[in-house]
Amino acid sequence: MVKNYLVCAVRPIQDGWLHQKRTDLYTFYKQMYELSVASFRKFVEEPFEAILWEEPVKNNDEYTVANWNAIKELWNREPCNIFWAGADTIMTQPTKLFSDQVKEYRLFNYTDPRSYKEFPHYFNDDIQYYPHTMSKEIWDLGEEMWNQREGHPDQHWGFDQIRHNTMFWKQNIPESDRLHPWLAYQAMQLRTMSPEEIEAHNQWNGINLRDAHILHFHASRGSQQVINLMNFISKEVGII
């Protein structure tokens, strides 16, 4: 039997977030995670087990390596589907996450900027799907790319997203099946429910907020505002 896992990491980072000596982000993200996982437990339609990795790391580089190794070890332990959702995400309506129709490693929506370096279409990697049918070649590609990490200009922030985009775009997925913004609505500057803010984000994502199933807040900026908004949304949709 194939198991389903919802995974996330909220780790103390010794050197701080992007070299900012801030301990408040860890506390903020712990609060966000509790709201996030509660939303997935309410709305995900398939059975799943939630896992949170909390072991401390020295810096952002170690953070990405630790998360990759944890996901890889879990995937190789038993037949399973793994859905990664960052702590600053919230699900807002019933959703099938672990569909057998999806056979490949997935990202779901653009990030900001929408293009970057060798990627004309650059996707956000804080929501990812590792199905049990994911190919060994894509796992191997992800492993091989660690050899490019040391000394890379984006080593301490962004390299992992480059690596994940390389894995995603290497696969033979129909172009019509790559973009699924309703599973990763990018709410990067959404901090209130003002009509103006919502409309700006609807335009960016190409869908209406009310049609989104998962929102991603990019909460290292305006963390307390995000917590307040996640609490508001949680009450509105009956999570708390």
Task: Write out the residue ranges for each language-model feature.
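Anionic group-transfer/hydrolysis microenvironments
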Residues: 10-11, 86-90, 218
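Short amphipathic alpha-helical segments and helix-helix/interface helices
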Residues: 34-41, 71-75, 95-99, 164-168, ...
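Short catalytic/ligand-binding loop motif for oxyanion handling, primarily in non-cytosolic enzymes
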Residues: 14-16, 58-60, 91-94, 99-100, ...
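A structural signal for short, well-ordered beta-strand segments and their strand-loop junctions
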Residues: 6, 49-52, 83-86, 107-109, ...
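N-terminal anchoring/stem segment of glycosyltransferases
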Residues: 1-69, 73-80, 221, 228, ...
